[in-house]
A protein has these predicted regions:
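Single-stranded RNA-binding regions, centering on S1/OB-family and related RNA-binding modules
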Residues: 1-281
C-alpha cells in the first residue's frame, strides 16, 4: 500500500522519455520524473522514494529528502502567502500548504514556525498545521518506563516561556528545558540531544542538556585531564568561574565541571588554587 508523505520502496515497471514509472499498487503507476533518475536504475529494480502530490494533486515520486514527513514536527520557513494560506519550504519542489484555519497566528513570508505535517482527511492532501498541541501526547505508565532519569532523547526546541523553552521530545511528547539548566545559546527550531530529568505527575517532562550520573562525571574528568596535559598542566577556570566561560570552553555545565574537578582532586591528580586548577607535579 502506498503511503503518502513518507518513504516507499517501489519497483520500476516502465521507462519513458520523461522519467520512470513505479508500481504504486492500488494507486496505479507513479511517476519518478527524469530529473531524479540515475544510471543505476533499471526496470525491475526496487528503489526507495518519497511520495507526495504534484501541482495537479497526483501522487509523484522523488529521491529528494524533505525536512520532515507525515507524522513529524518541523521548523519551516514561509516561502509565500496567498488568499488561502501560507506555503512552507520543506525541501521539495512543491511547497507545503498551511491553510489559515491551521495557523495559530497569521504566518508571514520569511518567518519560520513549528508545524506538524499531516494528510488532510477531507481532501487527501499533504498539509501543515501550526496547531500542534493536539498531536502531542502524554506518556502512558508503560511509556514512562522508557523515559527514566538520564534517558537520552532527541528534541525540537519549540518556544520560549517564562520558565525556559518548551520542546518536542522524540516527535511525540512535550518537555521543558528550564532556564537555569541551559548553558548554551538555543533557539526555536534547534534539534538537540537532551536527557530526561523528571516525568512530572501531570505527564509533562523536564529535560536537561547535560547527561547525568557518575559515568558522565568520569568521562568529562578524563577530557579535563587531557586538556591539562595539553596546556602546560594548567586551566584558569576554577569552581568559582562563571558558568558561561566554562561552557564556552568545554560545553558542559558549571555543575558538571565542579564534579569533574572534585573527582580529579580526590584522585590527587590536580591542585585547586585561586588562579584555577593545575596538575600535581
Amino acid at each position: 500500500m502506498l503511503t503518502l508523505g513518507d518513504y516507499n520502496t517501489l519497483r520500476i515497471v516502465k521507462s519513458v522519455d520523461f522519467g520512470l514509472y513505479l508500481d504504486g499498487g492500488e494507486e496505479g503507476e507513479i511517476l519518478l520524473p527524469q530529473r531524479y533518475v540515475t544510471n543505476d536504475m533499471h526496470i525491475g529494480d526496487e528503489i526507495e522514494v518519497f511520495i507526495y502530490l504534484d501541482q495537479e494533486e497526483r501522487p509523484v515520486a522523488t529521491t529528494e529528502h524533505p525536512i520532515a514527513k507525515v507524522g513529524e514536527f518541523a521548523w519551516l520557513e514561509v516561502a509565500w502567502v496567498n488568499q488561502y494560506g501560507a506555503f512552507l519550504k520543506w525541501g521539495l519542489m512543491k511547497d507545503l500548504f498551511c491553510p489559515f484555519r491551521e495557523q495559530k497566528m497569521c504566518m508571514e513570508q520569511g518567518h519560520s514556525y513549528i508545524v506538524y505535517i499531516k494528510v488532510d482527511e477531507d481532501s487527501y492532501r499533504l498539509m501543515a498545521t501550526a496547531k500542534i498541541d493536539r498531536y502531542l501526547s502524554l506518556p502512558t505508565k508503560e511509556e514512562e518506563d522508557t523515559l527514566r532519569h538520564g534517558t537520552q532523547v532527541e528534541i525540537l526546541v519549540w518556544q520560549k516561556t517564562d520558565l525556559g523553552f518548551k520542546a518536542i521530545i522524540n516527535n511525540r511528547y512535550q518537555g521543558l528545558l528550564y532556564e537555569n539548566q541551559i548553558f548554551q545559546p538555543i533557539h526555536s527550531g534547534d534539534r538537540l540531544t537532551a536527557y530526561i530529568d523528571h516525568v512530572r505527575q501531570d505527564g509533562k517532562i523536564d529535560l536537561t542538556l547535560q547527561p547525568s550520573g557518575r559515568q558522565h562525571t568520569l568521562d568529562f574528568a578524563e577530557v579535563l585531564l587531557r586538556y591539562l596535559y595539553e596546556n602546560d598542566g594548567h586551566c584558569n577556570l576554577g569552581d568559582k568561574s562563571p558558568a558561561e566561560l566554562i561552557y564556552d570552553r568545554f560545553q558542559v555545565s558549571k555543575k558538571a565541571y565542579k564534579k569533574a574537578i572534585g573527582d580529579l582532586y580526590r584522585r590527587r591528580l590536580i591542585t585547586i588554587g585561586d588562579d584555577g586548577i593545575s596538575l600535581v607535579k
